[in-house]
C-alpha cells in the first residue's frame, strides 16, 4: 500500500462511505443544506449540495488535503518551484495572467516583463490586422485567419473563440486546423481566398508532425494560388521557440511570438497561443479573459480550503473516483457557446492526471484521472443522460449555465434553465417504486403490468452533481471558469502525488508514429514488428484489403 492509502484519513473516508444517507434524506433533514453547500467566487456560483456528502465528509476530505500538503503544493506552484519534476520545469501558466506590477521568478529571472512585452506585441499585431492596415500580397486586407496547431495550441484557442462568438470583430473569421488527416485542411482551404488569408502556425519546435505538415500544405496552396515565396511573410506568422526554422520557412522575425518551457501546451491559451482569440475578440476582451483567470488564481491561492472552489470540486471528484469506483465524470454545458468545453476539460484533466506512478516512481494503488466526457444540454438529455439516471455506473456530473443568454428569444432560455435544474433534481431525487406505481394508478394496465412497468420506471437517484452558474458568459467569467478547472485538476494530482504536468504517453505515441511512418514509406523493413502492426502496414502499402 502507498502512504496515501495507508493514512488514517483515507481509511476513515473508506469507512464513511457505508454511513451516508440517501441525498433525499439529507435534503429532508437539513433546510439550510443549499445555503451551507454553495459559494460564490470570481463571478461564478457553485452549488455542491447535490453531492453524497455531509459536513463530516467534507471535514475528512479537507483533512486528506492537509495530510497531502495541498496548501504547500499550491504555494510551490505559484512561487515557480520545479514541480514538473520529470522535465525539471516550473509550472507558471498563472504568470501569463498576472498583473504587470507582480514579480514572478523562474530560473532566476523575473518573467513578468517578458509576458507583458509579448502582450504588447500581440496588441500591436491585432490592431494592425483588425484595422485593415495589414495587407496581403495583392494589397487586400485580411478577412480570414487559419490557426494551425495540435493539442493545447489548437483546442484552447478554438474552444475559447467559439465561446466568445458574441464578441467577435466584424469582418474577420477564423478556421482551426489540427488533424493531420488531409481532409481537414483541404475542406478549410476550399473556403478561403489566398489574397486575404493569414495563417498562424503554433508549434514550440516548429517541427510538430501534424502542425508542420498542415503548414507546408497551406504554404503549397498559397504558392499555387499565385503567391510568391517573398509574399509568405505577409500571410504567415508563428508562435514558436524555434526562430531559425520559422524564418527559414519565410516568416518575418518580427512576426514570431514566443513560447516558454514553463507553460505546458494544455495551459497555453493565455499566452501568444491565444493570438487567434485576440484577433477575433480584440485585446481588451483578451485581457478581460486573462483577468478572470487571474481572479481565480488569487482565490485558489488565498481562500481557506473549506471556502476554496477549485479545492471543493477537486476533492468531490476524487471522493467518487477513489471511494465509489466512479470511472468517469460528465461535463454538461447548458449554453450553446460553451459546447466545446467538455472536450477542452477532457484534454486538461486526462492528459494531466492520466498517470500511474507517484512522483518518486511508486506504482499507485488507487484510481487517478477519470474519463472526462460530456456535451451540450439539452441534446444529451435525449441520449446519454439515460445512462446517468438508470445505468449501473456512478457518473458524477457538472452542470454549467449562464443565468442570462446572449440571445434571449421568447421562452428559450427559461426552458433551457428548467431542463438544467430539473436534471440535477432528477439525478438527486430519483423515483421510488411506490412513486412509479402511483403514477400508473389510473392507467388501463392490469395490476401485474403496473407492477412490472413500475420496476422499469424506478430510478435510484442519489446521483451526484455540481451546478455552476454565472450571470452571463463574458470573457472574464470564461477565464475564471477555465482557471477553476485547471486548479481543480491540480488539486487531485497533488493529493494523488503524481506529476500533472508531463505527458509521456503522448510522447510515446509521437515516437512510434514517426517510426511507423518510416516503415510505411519503405525506408525501413517492418517485418521485425509484431505481426499485427506488420500486417496493417503491409495492407496500407497495398492500398486495398
Swiss-Prot record:
<dbReference type="InterPro" id="IPR001672">
    <property type="entry name" value="G6P_Isomerase"/>
</dbReference>
<dbReference type="InterPro" id="IPR018189">
    <property type="entry name" value="Phosphoglucose_isomerase_CS"/>
</dbReference>
<dbReference type="InterPro" id="IPR023096">
    <property type="entry name" value="G6P_Isomerase_C"/>
</dbReference>
<feature type="active site">
    <location>
        <position position="382"/>
    </location>
</feature>
<dbReference type="GO" id="GO:0005829">
    <property type="term" value="C:cytosol"/>
</dbReference>
<comment type="pathway">
    <text>Carbohydrate biosynthesis; gluconeogenesis.</text>
</comment>
<keyword id="KW-0963">Cytoplasm</keyword>
<dbReference type="GO" id="GO:0048029">
    <property type="term" value="F:monosaccharide binding"/>
</dbReference>
<dbReference type="InterPro" id="IPR035476">
    <property type="entry name" value="SIS_PGI_1"/>
</dbReference>
<dbReference type="GO" id="GO:0051156">
    <property type="term" value="P:glucose 6-phosphate metabolic process"/>
</dbReference>
<dbReference type="GO" id="GO:0097367">
    <property type="term" value="F:carbohydrate derivative binding"/>
</dbReference>
<protein>
    <recommendedName>
        <fullName>Glucose-6-phosphate isomerase</fullName>
        <ecNumber>5.3.1.9</ecNumber>
    </recommendedName>
</protein>
<keyword id="KW-0312">Gluconeogenesis</keyword>
<dbReference type="GO" id="GO:0006094">
    <property type="term" value="P:gluconeogenesis"/>
</dbReference>
<dbReference type="GO" id="GO:0004347">
    <property type="term" value="F:glucose-6-phosphate isomerase activity"/>
</dbReference>
<dbReference type="GO" id="GO:0006096">
    <property type="term" value="P:glycolytic process"/>
</dbReference>
<dbReference type="InterPro" id="IPR035482">
    <property type="entry name" value="SIS_PGI_2"/>
</dbReference>
<keyword id="KW-0413">Isomerase</keyword>
<comment type="function">
    <text>Catalyzes the reversible isomerization of glucose-6-phosphate to fructose-6-phosphate.</text>
</comment>
<comment type="similarity">
    <text>Belongs to the GPI family.</text>
</comment>
<feature type="active site" description="Proton donor">
    <location>
        <position position="351"/>
    </location>
</feature>
<dbReference type="InterPro" id="IPR046348">
    <property type="entry name" value="SIS_dom_sf"/>
</dbReference>
<feature type="active site">
    <location>
        <position position="510"/>
    </location>
</feature>
<keyword id="KW-0324">Glycolysis</keyword>
<dbReference type="Pfam" id="PF00342">
    <property type="entry name" value="PGI"/>
</dbReference>
<comment type="pathway">
    <text>Carbohydrate degradation; glycolysis; D-glyceraldehyde 3-phosphate and glycerone phosphate from D-glucose: step 2/4.</text>
</comment>
